[in-house]
Structure formats: C-alpha cells, structure tokens
Amino acid sequence: NPNYVIEASDKDIIALKEKVVTEFFFEDQNLTEYYLEHKVLWLNSDDRIEEYNKVYLPYASNASLVANKARVIKKTGEIIVLDASKILQAENEETGSKYNYFAFEGIEKGSIIEYYYVEKRRPKYQGARVDIESDYDKQFVEFDLYAPTNLLFNFKSFNLETAVVKDESSTEKLHWQFAVKDLQGIDREEQAPYTAAIGYLMYKLHKNTANNTIITSYNEVAQNLYAFYYPGYTEEENKLIEKFAKKIAINADEDEENKARIIDLYLKENIYISESGNDELK
C-alpha cells in the first residue's frame, strides 16, 4: 500500500495524486479505448466531505465499466475498503438512464479517499480534453496515452509549462506521458472563463501510418469540443436569444472586435448571477 504523506495545512482539500491512463488498441479488428482514472484526495472540511460522500462514475450507452475500487484512509491509519454493497446504482427519473457511484462512509476531517475505475468505451480520437488544474492544490498529476505503433497522436498543452512527451523506450506500443508536481489551485472568479483559464491537455489521433492517412485536424477537434460544451439550442431558446440580442445597441458598421466588446460590456452590466435559491423563483 502506498504511504501518503500530508503536511500540516489549512486547505480544505488537496489532491495527493491524480492519474489518467488511456489506451487504444485493436480488439477483433475494431479500435477500442480503455480509460482509467485514479484519484487520491485529502479532505479537510465538512463541505468537501459532503461533496465527496458520493463519487459518480461515468455512464454512456456505448461504454462499460470493467473495474473499480475505492477506500477511505482515516487519520489513525484505519482503512475502510468499499465492498460491492457500497458501489450503488441509481436511475435518472427523467431520462431513465442508470449510473453507478461510490458511496463513501466513515470520512472525517483529515481523511483520505482513494478510488479508481476503468471504462471500456468507443474511442475518443477526434479530440479529447484532460483537465490538469482545478480549484484545489495537487501534489502529483500524471497522464499517459498508449496506442498501436501505426497510430500517431498529437498533443497540445494550454496554460501549462509542461508538455506531453513521447516515451522513446517503448517499442511494442507507442507511449506518450505527462507528469507535473505541486500545482496550485485556480480560484473560480465571477464572470471569468474558468474552463479556459485552467491548465489542460488536448489530444487527437493524427495519422495512421499503415495507410499514411491524416485522420483529423485541430480545426475539427475544436469543432467537436465546441459542440460538446455548447450544444445546439431549441427553437424556443433561439427566439429568446434573438429577443435579448435586439436590446444590445450595435452599429452595423462596427468591426467584429468592437462588436464583441460592446456585447461583453452589456452582459457584464445587465446580467447578474445569484447564489441564493428560493422555491418562488422556479
């Protein structure tokens, strides 16, 4: 068992380890992806404990969960391993889709939760994003990608000094890796594009050397990711957007940059986000 060390800290959460491993290979002549996520989190506040009492596992109709394990390590050193009865399944009443989650018990301030899962899924090779930074400190973060020797991947890092590098010692398969230590958390700020501000990686399948085919460009990657983060609107939503847009006074002769600045200023002066909730607002 690894020996995780925590120095005295007033932080509410610290990631001792976060690791993502994804491997592409051919299974019955079909390209398949196995995706592993492993996290070790030190929790030191009631809010964070409540947040991580349940950890939801990914669900997709074209994927299956092939392995998972979780445990709690208390300050005293006592270890509580989650057995099968603590890996629960729930159902979304609206969509009918089912999902699994870890139901942690016995977490106290200063406890560590550790979990991993392995998912078999349809390969995401036309553009995928891996977040490296978040709103809490991280001691160690790793990313590894393995692929058959004929499939070449491209990588880009954003808001990071470290880049993905190829492991030249790997011969039976291609291997790219990324590792970084001691990352500071990035605070969430109102009206700030948080997902664009944190450090993250993007990767995509670039070339199949078996037939010398270029698979996809970063323009296609950007389109795929944009469609994922900003899905299309309904007809009713489009009408509301058009109605709202008419309130913004923009001269048709303005260039695109000035139009963007005018829209940005209008949104900041007229749109407010409230953290409070009330049934009467529904």
What feature does the model see in each segment?
Residues 1-121, 126-137, 141-142, 281:
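Lumenal/extracellular ectodomains and adaptor appendage modules
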Residues 1-3, 120-125, 129, 133-135, ...:
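Secretory-pathway-linked proteins and extracytosolic
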